[in-house]
Structure formats: structure tokens, C-alpha cells
Swiss-Prot record:
UniProt record similarity statement: Belongs to the purine/pyrimidine phosphoribosyltransferase family.
PROSITE patterns per the UniProt record, alphabetical: PUR_PYR_PR_TRANSFER (PS00103)
Pathway, per record: Purine metabolism; AMP biosynthesis via salvage pathway; AMP from adenine: step 1/1
Biological process terms in GO annotation: adenine salvage; AMP salvage; purine ribonucleoside salvage
Class of this enzyme: transferase
Function as written in the Swiss-Prot or TrEMBL entry: Catalyzes a salvage reaction resulting in the formation of AMP, that is energically less costly than de novo synthesis.
Major localization listed first in the record, in broad terms: cytoplasm
Species whose genome carries this gene: Mus pahari
Top-level division of the source organism's lineage: Eukaryota
Annotated coiled-coil segments of the chain: none
MF terms (GO), sorted A to Z: adenine binding; adenine phosphoribosyltransferase activity; AMP binding
Name by which UniProt lists this protein: Adenine phosphoribosyltransferase
Modified residues (N-acetylserine): S2
Residues carrying Phosphotyrosine: Y60
Amino acid sequence: MSESELKLVARRIRSFPDFPIPGVLFRDISPLLKDPDSFRASIRLLASHLKSTHSGKIDYIAGLDSRGFLFGPSLAQELGVGCVLIRKQGKLPGPTISASYALEYGKAELEIQKDALEPGQRVVIVDDLLATGGTMFAACDLLHQLRAEVVECVSLVELTSLKGRERLGPIPFFSLLQYD
């Protein structure tokens, strides 16, 4: 991994204390998206990791609603594979399957179209940030329901103190940047 590219990416993540609620330190990726060099570097770094780890044995990238959509298609294009969408409930047409996950005050659901993947296809799930792991875990559940193989989950940022990586169990996880 190129240290200079990683530094370029890290410089474009800013922090906002007490947002959206007191006690939370929000990691904002907006400056990264605004800067084409930093965004390209983030895609190159993620793609480089996946190429070296899976040597071309990835069929699809699955982008998580909504900020995973910002990275999923570009990452898929860099790898020469397709991209499928995992959406919040009620956003996809046609037959879907769903998986629930816990929120701070209730629960939510993710969906994927039933015909999005074939059994045995190898998929990498991407999102902008891993916190508690609830959304990523629900996405893994969806892909397992379709009998696809989740080969890895990746994100730009990982909040290590929230232990989301542990929630994923044996599924490999990679992040470019780690914060407490």
C-alpha cells in the first residue's frame, strides 16, 4: 500500500465532535469526495488490496446504501467486475429478499433483488465506514440467503472502539483508515 496515497486519503477525512448527537465524533468523507486525487487514491488502494488478496477471484462488488454507492461502482470498474446494490427497505423494484439489523432506537432492513446474484458468486461488500457492524452483518446475511460467497468486506474508515469487525465473525474485513 502506498504510504503517500494513504496520507492523501487520510488528510481528506475531517472530524466533527458531538455530531449527530453529543458524545459522537463524526468522521466526514465529504472532502475526500470533493477532491478527485484523494478519491482516486482511495479506490486504487482498496482495489490494490483486493487484487493482491483475491487474485482476480471476485465476481461482484456489493455497495451498501447509501455511501457505499459512492465507492462501489468505481471500485468495481477498477477491478473489471460488476456492481450490485444493497438498499434500504422499499427502494428496489421487483422481488427482493431482506435482512433486519438493529439501530440505536429500533431496527431497519436492507434489501437486495432476488436475481442480483447467482449461487456461488464471489462478492466483496463495500461501505464508507464500519462502526458497530450491524449494517455490514445484515448485508452478509442477504448475500448468504442468495447463496453467494462473501469473500471480504471493506470500508474506507473503521471505528475500532465499536468492534464492528468482531461482529462479522470469520468474514475477512479490511479498512484503509482506523480511528478509535
